[in-house]
């Protein structure tokens, strides 16, 4: 009898944990914004629609600057958190040396990103890289 009660308690606790996790993930979906942006600054995918356009300014052999301009009203205030990561894997140099970084503090109007390639044998390597951007309220 004690065994059945313990099993029942574990099942109920597990169900509550799953239900609360589902609620948290549903709420998190409302507060996270993601985008895939090409090395030329074209937005390939975004969820939800939160990016108006991207200004791309390449600096040959050094870095590429991207200003991601946000849709009006996407953020009432500056994002609480943003992260960026290079997704180019065309060569081993891209895998090992390509980097993307936030360039300054994100605002409710824009997020600045730079991409560059460090340690490459080619000093004139293309610094423009495709990247994924994620911001959260």
Name what the model sees in each region.
Residues 11, 15-16:
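N-terminal soluble segments of membrane proteins
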Residues 25-78, 89-100, 105-137:
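Extracellular receptor-binding modules and their adjoining Ser/Thr/Gly/Asp/Asn-rich linkers
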Residues 17-24:
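C-terminal segment of classical bacterial N-terminal signal peptides
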Residues 7-8:
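N-terminal export leaders
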Residues 83:
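Cysteine-dependent deubiquitinase/ubiquitin-like isopeptidase catalytic cores across multiple families
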Residues 1-4:
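N-terminal secretory signal peptides that target proteins for export/translocation
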